Amino acid sequence: MTPIEYIDRALALVVDRLARYPGYEVLLSAEKQLQYIRSVLLDRSLDRSALHRLTLGSIAVKEFDETDPELSRALKDAYYVGIRTGRGLKVDLP
């Protein structure tokens, strides 16, 4: 999978969960962060400074690790993509 595919997968899962739980602040925050990462991946000229302030990893662990492991894994992968992109490093997920 490519980095953008990891983001799209996580975004699809978040949108699905938001359909079930509209207005859930944690999911809305995750959606916003995923959309930002996606924008940065598609347009390299965008400001990347906010990539250093992502909270997707902690959201994944604190909110979904036990209750929704699929979403948790997708958010952790997306967080990894965002952090590596912010540091200008290669994203090497399986």
Curated annotation (Swiss-Prot):
GO biological process per UniProt: protein secretion by the type VI secretion system
InterPro entries: Tsi6 (IPR040818)
Gene Ontology MF, one: toxin sequestering activity
Description of the deletion phenotype: Deletion mutant cells show Tse6-dependent intoxication with a dramatic increase in division time.
Highest taxon above the source species: Bacteria
One Pfam family it belongs to: Tsi6
Known role: Immunity protein that plays a role in preventing early activation of toxin Tse6.
Protein name from the UniProt record: Immune protein Tsi6
Gene: tsi6
